[in-house]
Amino acid sequence: MTATQDLSFLSLISNASILVQLVLLLLLGVSLTSWTYIFSKMFAIKKARAQTEQFEKNFWSGGNLLELYQEAISNRRNATQKIGTMECIFEAGMSEYQKVKNANKASLDAGAMLDGARRAMRAAYQREMDLLESHLSFLASVGSVSPYIGLFGTVWGIMNSFRGLANVQQATLAAVAPGIAEALIATAIGLFAAIPAVLAYNRYSHEIDRLAIRFETFIEEFSNILQRQSR
């Protein structure tokens, strides 16, 4: 078997055209980056879920809200890692509630205190959700674009294969097989990059949506508690 008929994976890549090699290199880089985001997002969501469950347990244990607020402030200042999303929301709402309350001791406006706390919690919620949803758009882009990039490499490789037939007197399968094989590698790697990215995007989007519902529910429940306390 000649070198041009060697259909091993490495041989096909090394003998591919420069453009096809660039496509393969691009897809490999995109795939490695997406896998990095997949694992980092998996750990981030797992951590966010554990922190949420722990804070909910502490919040609904019947303890004093001011003590829980002081604990949240202490955790933010002393923790080597970022505090949980729900704890951030609680701290933001309680902080704003206390500021408005202390600034209007003479004439307490329950509506103003509640509105300020709710706006602060919403702002904290949006900031935290932006962090949780970071890199999801990249995974979505990889899942939708990678197959087309691979298809581009495939089309280019097949064009080169048929262009090479112009220099031979008799067209045989052996003459075009290496070129077609190298072209199909681009499609395979494109799918290899796209499929995990799509699966991860769908899974993580669902997990984050479930967390978002818990955060929004907490905002409403905590707002009701503050409303009762401000009467």
Regions found by a protein language model. Name each.
Residues 183-197:
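Hydrophobic alpha-helical transmembrane segments of polytopic membrane proteins
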Residues 169-183:
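Hydrophobic alpha-helical transmembrane segments and adjacent short intramembrane/lumenal linkers
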Residues 50-149, 160-172, 199-231:
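Predominantly long cytosolic amphipathic alpha-helical stalk/bundle segments
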Residues 28-48, 151, 158, 193-208:
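Alpha-helical transmembrane segments
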Residues 1-57:
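Hydrophobic membrane-targeting segments
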Residues 14, 18, 24, 134-137, ...:
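Internal alpha-helical transmembrane segments of multi-pass membrane proteins, especially GPCRs
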Residues 145, 152-155, 159, 181, ...:
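Gly/Ser/Thr-rich beta-alpha loop segments that engage phosphate groups in nucleotides
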